[in-house]
């Protein structure tokens, strides 16, 4: 039997506000446990929440970016459940009247095609605290620094049909919230977490299968692995005569498997009701109109512009527009050197390799956009060859200065004097007289292979400084004379 996968994702994006959603406590990551929890966060009697306006602004920006309906009036609700790191015994969230309604996001698939994923809603809520198990023998500790941190929960429609599509969607959300400046997207620190709802059904069947939810997956790689494992688990279970149980599961990356955590709750289990401590939030059309003017160029728009304005391939444009910082870096380099394709190649290949090797983000690059743009100019004006440029790039990465300073200090300037190159070629050919005779006696096919040998010898003799184009032209004339 052929099976079809149905996936819906719930992404929790931690909003980049300075303070919490209902208190003035800091949201900074990494503080000592329980040093950033106010009386409101601790749910002390007599305290009342005050809504953070910046969180509302960020949620509205997101809604505008996904072309969603933003309700004029939205309401906070209490989601009731007991957990040790939830001091109030309920989480302040939104249920019937979320701040962001239906919208959509277009994702790019591996084959270059585009698919539209519906977004059901996005609502504001507060995060819970954190249970600590490793540092206490036979006990658990509670850190409430995270309690009250503002989250935007983004709920997709069940439009996703594979693990790779799911990763593409999460990457698109990740890029979007970073472009908007509403979330830093740091998955390792929990700033972006994903719950994956996965079910399978016979191909062609309209009715959904029973879904399982995989909680709190925090990397693109783990999202793909967790979903693929869950798909296989459900198919094998059904084909063996069993039934999928609606439940919440956890992904164990060490064993590459999901395991049952608890039975899946429905909305009724949480006994939602309007929060009596918070008035409805009214968002006027004029407020949204002003926010719309603040929207930056979004990832899809930037990718399309890179293709049309700079003539980049869809793949290159996609990579370079993946983050706002990467796109800005590329455009600075291009603005200096005036060659988009050379700039794209150096940013994606050489710089990308350097950053990956050292585990750095583009904003931590040891080579500035100004340095890289200046170096590419020296390739274009034939001051250095592409091979020498790699040496210059490495020196810039080691902090040895600008391209011009390094070229001067190391004597790397390309030899373009025809007379000097001819003299060097005569010496190379004289030292390889036997190979010259073999070349002249060979047919065209063999000559092509042998020509590379002479070019290599010439570049070796010039220590890579001779202009490759001139070497090729002059060498061909001499060998065929």
From Swiss-Prot:
Keywords: ATP-binding, Ligase, Nucleotide-binding, Protein biosynthesis. It holds the Pfam family GatB_Yqey. The keyword Protein biosynthesis applies. Gene3D superfamilies: 1.10.10.410, GatB domain, N-terminal subdomain (1.10.150.380). GO terms for biological process: glutaminyl-tRNAGln biosynthesis via transamidation; translation. It comes from the Bacteria. Its EC number is 6.3.5.-. It is an enzyme of class 6 (ligase). InterPro entries: Asn/Gln-tRNA_amidoTrfase_suB/E, Asn/Gln-tRNA_Trfase_suB/E_cat, Asn/Gln_amidotransferase, Asn/Gln_tRNA_amidoTrase-B-like, GatB, GatB_C_1, GatB_Yqey_C_2, Gln-tRNA_amidoTrfase_suB_CS. It catalyses: L-glutamyl-tRNA(Gln) + L-glutamine + ATP + H2O = L-glutaminyl-tRNA(Gln) + L-glutamate + ADP + phosphate + H(+); L-aspartyl-tRNA(Asn) + L-glutamine + ATP + H2O = L-asparaginyl-tRNA(Asn) + L-glutamate + ADP + phosphate + 2 H(+). GO terms for molecular function: asparaginyl-tRNA synthase (glutamine-hydrolyzing) activity; ATP binding; glutaminyl-tRNA synthase (glutamine-hydrolyzing) activity. Belongs to the GatB/GatE family. GatB subfamily. Allows the formation of correctly charged Asn-tRNA(Asn) or Gln-tRNA(Gln) through the transamidation of misacylated Asp-tRNA(Asn) or Glu-tRNA(Gln) in organisms which lack either or both of asparaginyl-tRNA or glutaminyl-tRNA synthetases. The reaction takes place in the presence of glutamine and ATP through an activated phospho-Asp-tRNA(Asn) or phospho-Glu-tRNA(Gln). Heterotrimer of A, B and C subunits. This is Aspartyl/glutamyl-tRNA(Asn/Gln) amidotransferase subunit B. It comes from Pseudomonas aeruginosa (strain UCBPP-PA14). The gene is gatB.
């Amino acid at each position: 039997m052929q099976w079809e996968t149905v996936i819906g994702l719930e992404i929790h994006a931690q909003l980049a506000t300075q303070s919490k959603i209902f208190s003035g406590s800091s949201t900074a990551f990494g503080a000592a446990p329980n040093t950033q929890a106010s009386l409101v966060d601790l749910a002390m009697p007599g305290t009342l929440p005050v809504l953070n306006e910046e969180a509302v602004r960020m949620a509205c920006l997101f809604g505008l970016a996904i072309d969603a309906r933003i309700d004029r009036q939205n309401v906070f609700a209490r989601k009731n459940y007991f957990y040790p790191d939830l001091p109030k015994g309920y989480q302040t969230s939104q249920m019937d009247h979320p701040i962001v309604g239906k919208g959509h996001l277009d994702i790019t698939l591996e084959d270059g095609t585009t698919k539209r994923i519906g977004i059901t809603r996005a609502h504001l809520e507060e995060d819970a605290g954190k249970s600590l198990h490793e540092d206490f023998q036979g006990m658990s500790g509670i850190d409430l620094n995270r309690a009250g941190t503002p989250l935007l929960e983004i709920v997709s429609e069940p439009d996703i049909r594979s693990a790779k599509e799911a990763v593409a969607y999460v990457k698109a959300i990740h890029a979007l919230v970073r472009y908007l400046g509403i979330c830093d997207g740091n998955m390792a620190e929990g700033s972006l977490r994903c719950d994956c709802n996965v079910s399978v059904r016979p191909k062609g069947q309209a009715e959904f299968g029973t879904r399982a939810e995989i909680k709190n997956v925090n990397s693109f790689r783990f999202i793909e692995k967790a979903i693929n494992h869950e798909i296989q688990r459900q198919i094998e279970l059904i084909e063996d005569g069993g039934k999928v149980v609606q439940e919440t599961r956890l992904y164990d990356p060490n064993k590459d498997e999901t395991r049952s955590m608890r039975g899946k709750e429905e909305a009724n289990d949480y006994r939602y009701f309007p929060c009596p401590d918070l008035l409805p939030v009214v968002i006027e059309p004029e407020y949204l109109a002003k926010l719309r003017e603040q929207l930056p160029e979004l990832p899809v728009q930037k990718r399309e512009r890179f293709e049309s304005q700079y003539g980049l391939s869809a793949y290159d444009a996609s990579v370079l527009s993946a983050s706002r910082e990467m796109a800005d870096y590329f455009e600075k380099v291009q603005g200096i050197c005036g060659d988009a394709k050379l700039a794209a190649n150096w940013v994606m290949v050489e710089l990308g390799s350097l950053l990956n090797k050292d585990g750095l983000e583009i904003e931590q690059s040891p080579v500035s956009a100004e340095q890289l743009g200046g170096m590419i100019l020296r390739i274009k004006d034939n001051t250095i060859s592409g091979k020498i440029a790699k040496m210059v790039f490495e020196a810039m990465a080691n902090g040895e200065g600008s391209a011009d300073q390094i070229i001067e200090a190391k004597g790397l300037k390309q030899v373009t004097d025809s007379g000097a190159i001819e003299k060097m070629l005569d010496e190379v050919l004289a030292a390889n007289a036997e190979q010259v005779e073999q070349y002249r006696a060979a047919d065209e096919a063999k000559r092509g292979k042998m020509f590379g040998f002479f070019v290599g010898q010439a570049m070796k003799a010039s220590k890579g400084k001779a202009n490759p184009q001139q070497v090729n032209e002059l060498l061909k004339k001499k060998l065929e004379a």
